């Protein structure tokens, strides 16, 4: 083996020793399961390209409040992505994350927002187009149960 082959062998050996295997746990709420399955794959590939490290992201999903309670009670979450700031605040109040978490990243540390939509009957017979239309006589509003839906709060 020539000196280039020996050098390349040492370089490859050093690179494999320096690369890390990283495991993370993202504790999140139910509707984000599919989103994070895709996002985690993309992030892992990006991180590998940038650092050489292998990242495996495990997921735990459930109701936002239940997931907050799991973290408060000791589940070792590396990332928390919950439906409500209230649930993240509860974790911070118990000292599991920094109380100033909301100031850590742009947009109050919210990586995305939910879009509000109005679902109307076919043809929109009551001509509902904006928030003010919801208080017209004869218009009824149906919302999710705030006891079971993070989006309803």
Please provide the spans of the model-predicted regions.
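Basic/polar N-terminal segments that are highly enriched at the extreme N-terminus
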Residues: 1, 18-19
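Bacterial N-terminal signal peptides that target proteins for export
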Residues: 1-8
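Extended rod-forming repeat segments used as scaffolds/tethers
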Residues: 9-10, 37
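Short, linear, compositionally biased motifs with a strong N-terminal bias
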Residues: 10-11, 86
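N-terminal signal peptide c-region/cleavage motif recognized by signal peptidases
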Residues: 14-16
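N-terminal segment of the mature folded domain
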Residues: 20-148
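Short, compositionally biased segments
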Residues: 150-153
């Amino acid at each position: 083996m020539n000196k280039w082959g020996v050098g390349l062998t040492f370089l490859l050996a050093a690179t494999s020793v320096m690369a890390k295997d990283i495991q993370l746990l993202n504790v999140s709420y139910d509707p984000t399961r599919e989103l994070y399955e895709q996002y985690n794959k993309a992030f892992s590939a990006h991180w590998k390209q940038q650092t050489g490290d292998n990242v495996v992201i495990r997921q735990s999903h459930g109701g936002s409040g239940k997931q907050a309670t799991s973290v408060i009670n000791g589940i070792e979450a590396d990332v928390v992505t919950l439906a409500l700031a209230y649930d993240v605040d509860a974790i911070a109040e118990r000292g599991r994350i920094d109380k100033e978490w909301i100031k850590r990243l742009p947009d109050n540390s919210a990586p995305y927002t939910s879009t509000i939509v109005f679902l109307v009957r076919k043809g929109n017979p009551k001509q509902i187009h904006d928030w003010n239309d919801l208080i017209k006589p004869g218009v009824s509003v149906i919302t999710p149960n705030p006891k079971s839906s993070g989006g309803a709060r």
